[in-house]
Amino acid sequence: FAAALAAVHVCAQPPASKPAAGAQVPLQAFLGVLNTNQVAARASLARIRDGWRDAYTAPMLELAGFVPILAVRVEVLAQLEQVTGRHSGGDLNPLYEWLWAREPGEHPDYAEFKAALYEQIDPRFREYFGRERKAIIRLDEIRWGGVWRDGIPPLKNPKMIPAKRASYLADDNIVFGVAIDGDVRAYPKRILAWHEMVKDRIAGRELNGVYCTLCGAMILYDATVGGVHYELGTSGFLYRSNKLMYDHTTKSLWSTLTGTPVVCPLVGKGIELKTLHVVTSTWGEWKKRHAGTTVLSLDTGHQRDYDEGAAYREYFASDRLMFGVPKLDPRLPNKAEVL
């Protein structure tokens, strides 16, 4: 993660010329705030302040976590706190909540800004954004999750074992059960939490199980629509604290919760992945009801701590959110499990 942050910093370069009165501050000025030359970085920030519009809040928030010079980062946060009237304390979520509660408009080059910013972390990220990409969700709600594309590795046709050989599982461990045309399988939460996606052939069908560790949603999709198979992966980005998938062919971003493309050339073409039934159960109850079930082996080809509850243990030990959402429902605590 630290290496990724370092990769964003831009080299010293002459500051962008000051825009004419009433003109938008150019894209170059926003990226200039990341300059490793303090004079140039502060000059870029000054141009943004002088021509400030609320539409600049989104790119400034995305820059805030990457500014390499502490003094400049403090100035960026001060500008954002002044505009929003909120104190961040180093947590950007309250500032994002202010933004999402409004319709501030969008810088005309905002999509290109996201492409230019995040391609410095992973060049493949540019494929998600850019001026020509259609979107049906707010781009300022798409946040980087801190990993590269497929940095959370999916499980592909993983090794399955009979229930009697799964000595690593306790009866109270949580599994996601699938039963299709007599093919019965269990995918332990403790394993999927590290991979967030399993691509498996179940009852002769190529299916994708998508698990979002942060929000706890497990959904099984048939990724073939109209005879076209969409090979899915983990994009590295989230929308409202829920992972966004991407497909290998069009590099579209897909909603995990709806199974539809949300940023891509396919938007508006009626494409929707078919959902299939998944049962969240204890291992003891699942194998009692399905004696012939198979279950994921610990031999995944990856080195992880697959103990129950090990994945994201510190995150789930508090009610603090890693990524904010536009609206919280106070009737339940943050991260409360709902089955």
Where are these regions (language model features)?
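Structural detector for internal amphipathic alpha-helices that build alpha-solenoid repeat scaffolds
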Residues: 14-21, 39-53, 62-63, 71-86
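Phosphate-binding glycine-rich loops and adjacent basic patches that engage nucleotide phosphates
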Residues: 19-23, 36-42, 57, 171, ...
